[in-house]
Amino acid sequence: MKYTFHIVDVFSSMGVAGLAVLGMTATLAGAQTVEVKEKPPLYRYVSSWTFPPPHSADPDKDGSAGNQKILAAALADGTLVGYGDEENQVHSAERFAHASWGQARSIARLMKVVDALHKGGSSSTPLDSSTRHWDQIYITSFYNWKAGSWKGAYVYAGTSKLKPDAPDADDAIRALSSFYVPVFEKMLADGIIVEYEIDREMIHTTDARAQIHFSLVVPNAEGLDRFRDALGVALDQNSLIVPAFGSMMDNFKEQFDFVKVNATYK
């Protein structure tokens, strides 16, 4: 997919891992960045599976109604602020095919829903038991969304590993957000995206060094070109961002996902 490859190249070239301790101030001084206020922490629980086609589009038809009932109730009473399910559009042997997630303003609220899903949601199937699966919990203080539901929206998501000698993930995210949050906020106001977040792994079941994760939700296919164009303009106007944030990434080995999502935000 030529279109997706172009977007990956844009993010890959700038790198999202952070800034070196030495030279951080000097590098950012010439770039157009602003101080961004951190929001209260937001927690995101993600369950991923590598369901083989044709199951990847809807791997749990029998149990999805039970899950949706629990998630909708949790959103209505304020336990969750968002939830959704995703299907990867560019399949590979290493990456997930299907993922489900929920967002809450505390770990306690998040795990309350996870526990309810385990007890009263869909039951395990032979396909579930034979499929590779992993869970991750992310935390972020840099995020925003538009309330509502979107079916068949698109998500660009990327994960970058920090070098062993890099600043910690929180410092890297703060530096990253000084450029990206204003860009994403403008996209949100213009209707190009309906949600964004820049976060790090808090708890995970994969063996990896500290990681930074970003994701953006584009409401429809027509918005994909608008997103690409707006991001390209922002990067062209801030050329120093590329070397600044690329300096701490682990050999430019990002992981990127281009997925379709059904998402609801409160």
Give the predicted meaning of each segment.
Residues 30-119, 126-266:
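Short S/T/G/P-rich N-terminal loop/turn motif that feeds into the first structured element of a domain
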Residues 3, 21-23, 127-128:
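Compositionally biased, low-complexity segments enriched in small residues
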Residues 2-18:
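Bacterial N-terminal signal peptides that target proteins for export
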